[in-house]
């Protein structure tokens, strides 16, 4: 059970999203209260939907890009014993490709910042797959110019906001580059 604030209740985009989740049977909306039908549905609404969308896009381009192996929610323990979860990962062109998926507002007080996410993704790529590993941040929300510059410096590809609608094209360009 989750209660929405007045500010949330006044968001047309959120209203549409909640209606879609409600029609899919993921949650029920009663006034300003959300009731999830299960913990799995809550996790799906909280961001699992983006991971599933990204994995499906990877699966759709697998044949075109000669992707050999692919996984979602992959737990990896590196040589130092550090455990990391990779939202989506796949092998192509003898390289590991790692995708981090984010739906949260990374500019919100108290939330994980975009910079932290980018540094973490770059470090995971380095530790788990080595120098040839490529990283991509798929974010439901757009990033600011400073974060885009940081991603470029770190070698992290971005597919954010409205660009998610063209994820398959972005994946093809990313893997082939």
Predicted segments with their positions:
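Intrinsically disordered, low-complexity Ser/Thr/Pro/Gly-rich regulatory segments
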Residues: 1-177
